Amino acid sequence: SAYQYIQISSFPFPSLAVERTLQHISLQKSCLICPLRQYCCPKMCGILAIFGSSLPEGELRELLMKGSKRLRHRGPDWSGYQIHGNNGIAHERLAIMDPASGAQPMTDHDDNVVLCANGEIYNYKEVYAALPTPYNPKSGSDCECVIPAYLAYGKDFPNHLRGMFSFVVYDKRDNSYIACRDHIGITPLYIGYGKDGSVWFASEMKALHDACARYEQFPPGHIYNSKIQGFERWYNPEYITRTDLPSNPVDYTALRESFERAVVRRMMSDVPWGVLLSGGLDSSLVASICVRHMNDDPNAPFPRLHSFSVGLKDSPDLKAAKEVAEHIGTIHHNMEYTIQEGLDAIRDVIHHVETYDVTTIRASTPMYLMSRKIKAMGIKMVLSGEGADEVFGGYLYFHKAPNAQEFQEELKEKINRLHMYDCLRANKAVSSWGVEPRVPFLDYDFLEHAMGIDPNEKMIKRDEGRIEKYILRKAFDVEENPYLPKSVLWRQKEQFSDGVGYSWIDTLKEVAEAEITDDMFTHAKNRYPYNTPQTKEAYYYRQIFEEIFPSPAAAQTVPGGFSIACSTERALAWDASFATRGDASGRAVAGVHDDAYTEGHDVKKANSKNAPAAAAAEEPAAKKARTEEEEAKA
């Protein structure tokens, strides 16, 4: 049977024939008794809601369908529309089989509350168990728990949820509504304001950019409450609210176990899934934990985990990912792309990711190409390693942090801006092909644990043998049954766009140089007064972006400011040389390791032989990165 096939196959859903077999089973048996019922629930989707429209019902429905269709790549399996007076709610669903059941928008048993959700509630069982009044779910979707949570706790219900989500709850009893976004902004959400006074919510900007007079990113960790016609913050963790520095000493065992729990929570899946594996520390830890848990779980739906990496031929990431995959035992897929394939995809990437930020586009393009192949292989969910650098100070420029206070403030600012950069890239580039990305490093509980650690423990101190993300590496550096090879566990940080191949960035610069004339660039401020491009590459992306999204409101959804190796502007003051570096890539600070250790900690290279092995092991990687950069330029 198809069910047995899933259990024994070395590759999930390798052909359309298997999916058709599954669909046939769903037609022959009730969903309640089907052994594949757990694979039916909707997950990563696209949502659109319009409240207070002045249009007649027929025109409102037509407008709703038009906007929702632009989100169909996020949920290509089924569409659901509901009109309630002058309000419209639409849902584009990603499902495995039997698209006629479990559709959204969904309602409570009394048909009073309507939910339209995109995301994943990992603690849905706990939410149901803690309800003051028992609730019998109508479907197998974890997101349905939002409805009884709202009925039980009112506007405070998001505090009871753990996951990644953006959703709208409409209460027909008083014609009120609440929109909500998760604590970090892992899933995208925008709010728009129509000329007729209507309020819009959409998973992506493209659903509302030509229908709303103005729009903006919905702030993470907030709800929009129609009763006050404004935002209210629901996420108030201690690391944000406290004015002094956290002082908890690092407990390596507790840190490791906390992250393992975060990964395992995200292995809850209704679909065939895999991991994105660059070969760097973050994604490698995620993959290793997944494999360990699957090996220990006799009921694991698939016998082996599939991992995926992308890069130009002979790129650093492909080599490192293969090494990790061989160590942990995944079925690995190295996906090579050519520079021309990347260039051909740039316009589509900007359309899907909805940004003109240079580093985001550089990194999104190979991820976009990889996601297309992942979807073609039958995978609909992947785990990824985004967020670790923001939580542990993993970017190379953190070597220049002058003190613990500056280090911690930069971490907080980076986390607060994740929804505009890495989360935006990871979600939109991957979901552009109907694949759901999950990011365990941004788990609610793990984040509070990691951000409660004394920042002095996270700082880079070569005289103490501490390289970037030292405490994370140390937490997983075990001798018995090691998680990763030492060469990977202590490998230097690479930005994703660097790791896939240095010539990718150099070619992008060359193309921009050819496309954007000196005269065009000289008058950049006249054409783009907001976030004026500082390089020809930035001008090139901005030009494409405004052809797709011509509204001034669209440009203002993208953050600006100068950056070095993904820094915020505040960190530019850490080193005078940052102001003169012309590239936003991590390559711009490739030599920062030696400089920072020597200048910041007054440690001479001649004394490096006395440093701990972990710090010494990092130098070859840094040297190799600089050598490859020089070769690429030559």
Language-model features, listed with the residues they occupy:
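Acidic, Ala/Val/Gly-enriched low-complexity intrinsically disordered segments
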Residues: A2, A17-E19
